[in-house]
UniProtKB/Swiss-Prot annotation:
Pathway annotation: Porphyrin-containing compound metabolism; protoporphyrin-IX biosynthesis; 5-aminolevulinate from L-glutamyl-tRNA(Glu): step 2/2
CC cofactor: pyridoxal 5'-phosphate
Domain of life from the UniProt record: Bacteria
Protein name: Glutamate-1-semialdehyde 2,1-aminomutase
Gene3D superfamilies: Aspartate Aminotransferase, domain 1 (3.90.1150.10), Type I PLP-dependent aspartate aminotransferase-like (Major domain) (3.40.640.10)
Subcellular location: Cytoplasm
Residues recorded as bearing N6-(pyridoxal phosphate)lysine in the entry: 272
EC class name: isomerase
Pfam families registered for this protein in UniProt: Aminotran_3
Amino acid sequence: MTHMTSSNTARSAEWFEKAQKLTPGGVNSPVRAFGSVGGQARFIEKAHGSTLIDVDGNEYVDLVCSWGPMLMGHAHPAVVEAVQKAVVDGLSFGAPTIGEVELAQDIVKRTSVEEVRLVNSGTEATMSAVRLARGYTQRSKILKFEGCYHGHVDALLASAGSGVATFALPDSPGITGAQTSDTIVVPYNDIEAVRNAFAEYPGEIACIIAEAAGGNMGTVAPKDNFNDKLLAIAHADGALLILDEVMTGFRTSYRGWFGIDKVAADLVTFGKVVSGGLPAAAFGGKAEIMNMLAPQGPVYQAGTLSGNPVAVAAGRASLKLADESLYTTINANADRLHGLISDALTHEGVAHHIQRASNMLSIRFAEGEGHNFSDMKAADTFRFAPFFHTLLDNGVYAPPSVFETWFVSSALTDDDFSKIEQALKPAARAAAEAKAS
């Protein structure tokens, strides 16, 4: 796929060329390279509110929000102030701080977990939660779902979503058969497949791990009380349920996805919003299980920068701002974006369905809702690249992959939505005119 680089991306092109000589693919996370859509990746210089500004001075309405964390938009004054205050007192101590305890209290107050361990990334959170589940149950097998992405953990990359879906990789070289031999993969939203797996491996499965709502194969909501049924099946066999709320946590509601379906999983992972946009994440769960972690128990987990005081300050400030009224605004903005996208595509006669999981959304270029990874791939995905690039050329920054979720912030204005509406007209036309290769 080719897409012409226009003159107003000259500095991005220059820096991308330099980056490719120093960094694999020129990026530090694959989807940023525009690999599935082609064209010139934009190097962002700064952002304020709902606006991204690249190194060439181009401005974009941001519908990525750093892949979820920026609920209030970029550089919110209260978050900036909290970070500035933390920085002057020291960047890292390698010792306990009051802020760590207060952030843990914030998480416990809003979710079903009783205890929390802070880490540095969503990948660390899911890796640690799986290790803890195995240690607690004294079992080795784990069950995951096609299209659900839980970070680049070796055992969890089998049939993963996100960047793995974008680049059509079933897993990754460098991961041995031994590392995935205890990973059972079944279709998402298929409760009978889960029951069959437990029937085939009775007493062997340590945990089920699932995204609380799918966000890495496009947006796919759990259906028919799926998470509640997972919990019941796991407990009936002595296994645990891990719900990955790295994406949905404090994004989809005040209490995350737990606030929507009230399923109290044994272990829950958090990231993105809880970090305030800095490198931080967490996992938590029932005290009986969490107390298996060192130094209280035998399951080892550690991190030099875990609970970093600057990241903790950003996370606490973000959660303080994220009250119930904020979600009313974000949900309304998601509904408004949903309507604009659907109206534009309908006007051009493009078959589509807007996938929703609360205020998270994506586009399936086919009729009807997708309920699993196979459904999401069985669409006119070739329409997305021209749709994306036309939006980008008209000042709207959407996720550069059909398999990624769109995020809105409370910072979006009427002017932003007017810009989005105008950009969607030629974008929908480009999608309609696209041809399968």
